[in-house]
Amino acid sequence: MRRWAAFILAVLIVAGAVAASILLPVTTPQTQEISLPVSRMLSCPIGDSTLGKTVVAVTDQENFVAGELNALPSDPTANFNVENPTKPIIVRGSATVAGVSTYTVSNPDADHDMVIPCAPPITTGSWNGVSVDDGSALVFTNVDASSAVVDVFLYSQTGPIAVPGLRDLPAYSGVTQTLSINSNLVPSDTPISVQIRASKGRVAAVLRTIGDSGYDWQLPQTAPDTDLLIAGIPAGDGNRSLNITNTDPTNKAQITVEIMGESGSFAPLGLETIEMAPSRATSVDITQALGGQASAVHLVSDRPVTATVVLTGGDIAGISAQPALNGAVVMPGVGGTLWIANPSDETATLALDSSDSSGTQTTDSVDITAHTILSIPFPTSGTVKLSTESSVVRTSLVLDSPSLSILPISGGGIVTSVPAPQVAPGLG
């Protein structure tokens, strides 16, 4: 009798629990945005000391450490400057730390500056529109303590370029390697695409050009994407080419093109859509489409692709599709013009918090209309914090004296939406 009573009691308890779970309303935790603490590692490249001088400047609003690769870092500081380092400068700091390397090439006729942002190490990177006649070279450094292995892929308008010795390249810790991209390596009379992929570890990589066409350092596009924006194309004479690569070995890519200017955007006549076969690189002259005006190029593709705009005529400069500003970044004041591009359908706002060499603080903000670009002068000294709540705004710094450099600017901030934590006593 007692066993039956206990059994009936247990059944009633279970039935009550099931009924409660069905009848009681389910509460969904509220979602809120939280900022996750992020640390950032940057590598600042250097040039050949026998041909010129390298100067590295790094800034932040918080302390960071910096120093030559495989050497003791500096004491914690918010402002780091060094001349003529013998190895790349490695920086470890907050998500907003940023810096630039300036390499001045001495020339009997005139000095040429190559300026590039310090950037995180990568596992993949692509450059498009690389001319084998311009004295270009892929320069990569293993900035980590463990060894890495990289593969280099080349693409032309007719397909992949088979070059022996470009697979399973060892990248030893602390070692910088240079791979010349010239006619001896690549028999091509048209621009090609260069891609580096790390099958083990990661590397810091740049494309360097020193030749008759000009002088340039260029960061890679770090991953193929379906929505790309190339900002910071300055006004002026000379040729502008849009170079795109579809590295997919089996699927073609269909790409729509939008040219963004200061007063609006448009689809260039005859170039509204570009179709690309698998494993192909292409180069399209967009000089007439831009009309000598400052511009940004927005691409939307049904397959992940990579893209670069190359400027030639008097000097050479290239800028690849870049990530969004991504939170905030603190840049050293190096002058030039800051270009801001907003590809979204809504107005975006960029905040600028400047601090000059005397410590005077200035706060300002600018609104960027949907599908337009906007320019503002960039300070020549001190620091500038750039920040935005937009997830798509791109920023590029254009320096045109003594030579042309285009610097894509992005931060390392992360904001993510997560459910608010809730107490669940039933889980123990």
Where are these regions (language model features)?
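Short acidic, flexible loop segments centered on an aromatic residue
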Residues: 39-43, 57, 140-161, 198-199, ...
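Hydrophobic, ordered structural segments
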Residues: 84-113, 136-148, 153, 174-213, ...
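Exposed beta-strand and adjacent loop surfaces of beta-rich binding modules
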Residues: 135, 147-151, 191, 239, ...
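Intrinsically disordered, low-complexity "prion-like" regions in eukaryotic RNA/RNP-associated proteins
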Residues: 59-62
